[in-house]
Amino acid sequence: DSIIHHLQYLNAGFLAMDPSSGALRAWVGGIDHDFYQFDHVNSNTKRQVGSIFKPIVAAMALERGVSPCSLISASRPTYTDKEGVEWTPRNTQNDYQVEYTMRGTLAYSVNTVSAKLIQLAGVQPTISLARAMGIKSDMPEVPSIALGASSISLIEMTTVFACFANHGVAISPYYIRSIHDNDGKVFDNFKSEEPSKRVLSEETSELMISMLKGVVNEGTAGRLRYMYGVYNDIAGKTGTTQSNADGWFMAMTPNLVIGTWVGADDPRIRFRRTDLGQGSSTALPITAAFFKQVNKDESFKSITDAKFPKLTTDLQGRLDCDLYELSEDLIVEIEKSIFQRDSLIQADTSVKPPETFLQTIYKRKLKIRATQERKDSIASALEILEGG
């Protein structure tokens, strides 16, 4: 009974890294090293990474010339690998009729579109990029790696996101900065053993940072803002494995990159529902608590107040699109479903069916349209006043 009891404990790994140097600022291998002597950070501890692998796919697609504003259908593709095994990805939401841009694909973590992006980017080039960015673990040459089917360590994935924050220059982490005595006499200084190397264009890195900020501001990591009140300039990506065994959240600021993993020591132990086991519910709150703590400390102002550089006009233009588009036929279907839902609520106020994902993104579109119409009306009124 005792073994079963402790196997069900959730564990966690947490790592903070300086993206420009690779210096490690914080390392938490688990919840209690005296009892659970297992380090969930180091390179020997590998877990399926889920959707935190998707930014690597998107970056490779950008490098291959795919526009971040290109619309890609969320319909379900079927792929056959070299062994003849078929694979058909699916989404957590019933959104297969929606067309997503790369921005929306990352913000809403759309599996089917990510699977299509790796076909445009190339599976082997994507693996090569992942290796160049810092992943040394095995990655099978199959399309499903786009959704994080590979098992990779937390320190490797944090190194990957450090590459994005470091403008596309890959670094390797190091643990000890210097050795000195109590009087301050320095005996030795250390730095990363491997030289830094550019593996992504600066443009691609800046586009990726902007799109991953969208994940935090209006995507799957949105609760970092509205639930936990963390408003630092943060780009990030949530991740959840298919079996709900692993929850991830990767967060980037200009001067600090943070990787967080949550799960049981035994990957066979998992959450029964995705809403319980997803990275935004398990790993993200730990990152939020960290930021809320360091935000109180004046000595960390260089980290907490740092802002990512603004995009150039050209790069802003390349991202001048919405997250998704809805066809007229789909809009009609959504409007019917909203009418039916509202009618049910009016008929029985004790019954309030939850709003579907499609209804939510449709209403978002309406708000955007209304805001734009107000802006246009104000602009027209000002023109009339100036002309008069």
Segments from the language model and where they lie:
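A penicillin-recognizing enzyme superfamily signal
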Residues: 1-18, 27, 34-43, 53, ...
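Active-site SXXK
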Residues: 21-22, 46-74, 105, 160-164, ...
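Low-complexity, Gly/Ser/Thr/Pro-rich intrinsically disordered linker/tail segments
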Residues: 316-388
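C-terminal substrate/ligand-recognition segments
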Residues: 7-20, 24, 59, 63, ...
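Conserved catalytic neighborhood of penicillin-recognizing serine enzymes
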Residues: 66-126, 170, 182-207, 213
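Periplasmic/cell-envelope proteins involved in peptidoglycan metabolism and beta-lactam response
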Residues: 1-52, 66-70, 124-130, 142, ...
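Mid-domain, small-residue-enriched loop/turn segments at the edges of structured enzyme/sensor domains
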Residues: 86-91, 122-161, 168, 172-175
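Structured segments of extracytoplasmic/periplasmic soluble domains
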Residues: 27, 31, 59, 63-65, ...
